[in-house]
Amino acid sequence: MSTSTEHRWLAFDTSTDVLSLAVARGGQVWTQTLPGGAQASSGLIPAVLAMLSDADMPLASLDAIVFGRGPGSFTGLRTACAVAQGLAFGADVPVLPVDTLLAVAEEARWTQVQAGAIAPDAALTVLALLDARMDEVYSAAYRWEPVPGASHGRWHEALPLQVGAPEKLHMPNDLVVLQAGNAFSAYGDRLPHVAPGGLRCEALPTAAALLRLASALWAQGLAVPAEQAMPLYIRDKVANTTAEREAMKAQAVEAKTALAKAAAQP
């Protein structure tokens, strides 16, 4: 998939210990990587506004704000959703939520294609794995297939999102060509074995991957109003507590306030 030259996107992911941002305009892409984790809540809004300024792209000119909705760090997901809500409300643009494990799969496929390890038009199944802490792993499998007569392909879910002990993960029926994520150093041999001829590669849900996925998701009508920017939890902790909801509201207000201040500057 390639980023559409007809769309203007802002993308960010804060689901891991890395804060990833990107902006796309007219075929040009700006990317930035910053420390995530606890620093994401204070660093995301200034980084977004600075990147949009560098790209000479007003927030209101965006087609959508693309963000990683989870699974991942609870704090990181709340930050991403709150900032996406606040900026989208302030600029009157929709949001485009993307599963972080799909972004991992796309980043891994893209990286391996660029390295020459996988042919650009090769169909493959990717098992995406992210460290969920607490001795567990988030996982999902996706199948990428080329579109006949086109230069891009499509992703299909081969195995739904799950969380559990590494040795108890369900495997898709398709042959997994590529395992990707950040769980290998922590769990090693406890993870499913790599199929003969398969590969393992480190990959994170980057904002650049979100951009590459955005056009297809947009075409499927998956953009939603700002208030529907909600985190995806797949542990038992599926509902925000009152404190968490208040924290998200506060961050959303902060994002709208920052946007208003930026707009008021000469």
Enumerate the language-model features and the residues they cover.
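Short, glycine/acidic-enriched loop or turn micro-motifs at the edges of active sites
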Residues: 16, 134, 239
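DPxDG-like acidic metal-binding loop motif
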Residues: 66-94, 100
